[in-house]
């Protein structure tokens, strides 16, 4: 793809005809155990309460979408102008390719962003991996920054000088004695091994990631970050669990054109909202 065509694509993403100003962004954070949502202003400030419900089981696409519609009803009295989705699986071009923590038998090439957007009247939508969306809220925009989320599974994301380096999927790679990151430091591992052993595993994982990525900063998020009890290295910090929602604003207001190159083109065609 030529530089010229990339530039044109970036321009079309940010100024598509008919797309409203992104001043009421519905941000959705889909997790293995919970679904969360809030309405954000363009600067990331919350314009509604943050609402949450357990993830339905079985977590089929239709069940997740139906549950989300019920969840967000109280906070969208005024319709959202844009939709941001963080999803715990492999996402390409607003389509879920796989989602082991929700059930790969249900999640194979599922156009989830379009499914949710259609229920909201065709609102422009973007969807990325949930660790990537959390990272957009946490990063400082300088050097190599990595994100590790500790929840049902283990999510990862990587940024360079504020630019998302997309699709870093370490969760199902082996990390210790044949166990994957999910199996080693996911929630099932914490419950089985106990917090003390799990903390030692997370501490070991931080060292492994430092060797792997040689990061300048590591941001740790997710619900299980609250269970960390050891002293973190000076270049490692825990971020608010709300970051998974707050990063949704950055999908529509990236801090630089560098970030925009790695964001999916939204689901609308030019003039679709006219």
Residue ranges and their predicted role:
Residues 5, 16-63, 96-98, 163-192:
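Short glycine-rich, Thr/Ser-proximal phosphate-binding strand/loop in the N-terminal lobe
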Residues 25-29, 82-84, 145-149, 219:
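Short glycine-aspartate micro-motif
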Residues 34, 209-242:
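Glycine-rich phosphate-binding loops at beta-strand->alpha-helix junctions
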Residues 35-39, 89, 136, 154-159:
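Short beta-strand scaffold segments in enzyme catalytic cores
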Residues 49-73, 77-84, 90-144, 184, ...:
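Glycine-rich phosphate-binding loop and adjoining helix at the ATP-binding site
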Residues 114-134, 164-201:
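Glycine-rich phosphate-binding loop plus the immediately following alpha-helix
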Residues 143-175:
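Anionic-ligand binding region
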Residues 198-211:
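A short, acidic, amphipathic alpha-helical segment used as a generic capping/interface helix at domain edges
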